[in-house]
Regions:
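Conserved acetyl-CoA-binding loop-helix of GNAT-fold acetyltransferases
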Residues: 118-133
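Extended hydrophobic secondary-structure segments that form protein cores and membrane-embedded regions
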Residues: 52-57, 68, 106-107, 144-150
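Short amphipathic alpha-helix that is part of the acyltransferase structural core
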Residues: 2-47, 54
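A short, internal acetyl-CoA/4′-phosphopantetheine-binding micro-motif in the GNAT/acyltransferase core
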Residues: 108-118
Length: 205
């Protein structure tokens, strides 16, 4: 499955209560994500905190292939430790070192229909998101795609496979940036890890 095949098989739409009424219940295998996409997405939309989109099969419009929620975000340089700050400044080149934050978009939630797992849809959807925000359609600058990924091997592997890397190279530094007491039991491992994709790596059409 690649991006071209995804767009030929699916429609891309904003998620609304009407759309969900027309579809089978969406399940990606993570209860918290499924619950969010059933109801909480609307609160986020009403409060202007995030917009949720879906791909539906053209030949079976009742089946949602994938859903994701997007919000504005930024990578804030002052929150990074020295080695991670140097990495961001390296990829953004010398002329931009004085910026305190770099604009990005946050994938707040993303799920693929569990009946369609391991068929390449997840990678194709990520290719769509990165291409979408790298295109000239958008009215503001967006340098990075950011995600707060569930800290489990499958999820981390998915994002790494799709070109993401950790914002904090060491998990302990990420915990400190969150104000967590790393000496307390069960602080580590973190439930989620911040990761980013640098959109400058892909060219404009």
């Amino acid at each position: 499955m690649n991006l071209e095949e995804l767009l030929s098989e699916c429609t891309f739409e904003r998620v609304t209560p009407t759309l969900l009424e027309q579809c089978e219940p969406f399940a990606c295998g993570h209860d918290d994500l499924d619950e969010f996409f059933r109801s909480d997405y609307k609160l986020y939309a009403d409060k202007l905190l995030g917009k949720t989109y879906a791909f539906r099969l053209i030949n079976n419009p009742s089946k949602i292939v994938s859903i994701f929620t997007l919000s504005n975000d930024a990578i804030r340089i002052k929150q990074l430790v020295a080695e991670d700050k140097e990495q961001i400044e390296y990829v953004t080149e010398n002329g931009e070192k004085n910026l305190r934050r770099f604009p990005g978009v946050l994938i707040g939630r993303l799920g693929t229909n569990q009946t369609l797992s391991r068929k390449g849809y997840g990678t194709a959807v990520m290719d769509f998101i990165t291409a979408w925000f790298r295109s000239n359609e958008h009215k503001t600058g967006c340098r990075f795609i950011i995600v707060d990924a569930h800290n489990n091997p499958d999820t981390i592997r998915y994002y790494e496979k799709n070109g993401f890397q950790f914002l904090y190279s060491e998990e302990i530094n990420e915990a400190k940036s969150m104000g967590l007491n790393i000496k307390r039991p069960n602080t580590l491992p973190l439930n989620t890890r911040l990761m980013y994709f640098d959109l400058i790596k892909i060219g404009l059409d």
